[in-house]
Amino acid sequence: MMPALSRQARNALGFFAILATVGLFLPDYRLLVVNQHLFLALNVLALNFCLGLGGQISLAQGGMAGIGAYASVLAHAHFPQASVLVVPAVVLAAFAFAAAISRPMERLGEGFLAMATLGVSLIFTNVVLTMGDVTGGSAGLMVDSRLNLPGLGALSGDRTFFFLFLMVMACGCWTFAALKDSRPGRALLACKDDPLAASSCGIDRAALRSLSFGLGGALSALAGVLHAHYGGFINPEQFSLELSLKALLFLVIGGPGNVLRPLVAVLVLETLMSGMQFLGEARTLAHGLLLTAALLAGYWRSSRPRRRPPGSAVRVAEARKPM
């Protein structure tokens, strides 16, 4: 007999089954909006690797998504048929870059870490504006190349990219859950719960946080790659600080460390806010009230008494077990 699926696995299967059904039957012009929500959801999931596992508040998701987008577009301009090589190279480079900058930023301490990651997004924007001859500057850059996959050819269309976004999200959720249940994941949670106790037990906090930050940066870069080739046009405003702040907001609403709730929060709340166009100028107030209510609901949920999972001491002990 096959082992019974856990509750989390059943919830994940139901969530992605519902999204797949939506993608099959929703009209193309509706999918255009949904795909923008999925792009934001991928960045929320990327931030969850940093904050939900490593306890690192990051405002670099917009910059990392922009790095992935511009790197892929510029590389495809020279190698238009090499998507199979270009996309993995961009993602791996983003992982290496994020993991590398995490090390020195870790030494700044918790209070300055968010400010340091904010600098990544600001530096990205300044570099794009300065190198206008290559990046198009503030005017943006038209994306003439398309993603090409062997046997499928050039990928285009709202529905095709919907399922690409969905597939990347499913892989990201699986990676997050697998890492969380692994020994490095338990060590990361121990560092998050009690950094001093984890360090005193010999856990390399900086190396583990480099891993979580690198994975978050790589996922944001991949989201940027899909966003660039789907929309056909990129400019710095698409990857501004607003994207990083929205990712942080929705992650706080859904709960850092939970893999599905932040994604549901993005899709539900963004859909509701998109449907408030009829309110005219009052929609800004309505958006604020809706997000405030969602934040209060998230706070109420997190403050309810509940059975606590094993504490940091147990996680540290499990993380120290020999491989």
Regions found by a protein language model. Give the residues of each.
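Cytosolic-side transmembrane-helix boundaries in multi-pass membrane proteins
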Residues: 1-18, 142, 191-208, 272-323
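Membrane-interfacial amphipathic/re-entrant helices at transmembrane-helix boundaries
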Residues: 1-42, 71, 80-86, 157-159, ...
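Single transmembrane alpha-helix segments in multi-pass membrane proteins
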Residues: 23-77, 103-113, 190, 195-199, ...
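Residue-level recognition of pore/gate-forming positions within transmembrane alpha-helices
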Residues: 40, 66-70, 91-95, 119-123, ...
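Transmembrane alpha-helical segments in multi-pass inner-membrane proteins
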Residues: 62, 87, 209-296, 307
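Alpha-helical transmembrane segments within multi-pass membrane transporters and channels
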Residues: 79-122, 264-266
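Extracellular/periplasmic helix-loop junction at the C-terminal end of a transmembrane helix
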Residues: 120-154, 185, 302-308
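Helix-loop-helix "hairpin" substructures at the membrane interface of multi-pass membrane proteins
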Residues: 155-235
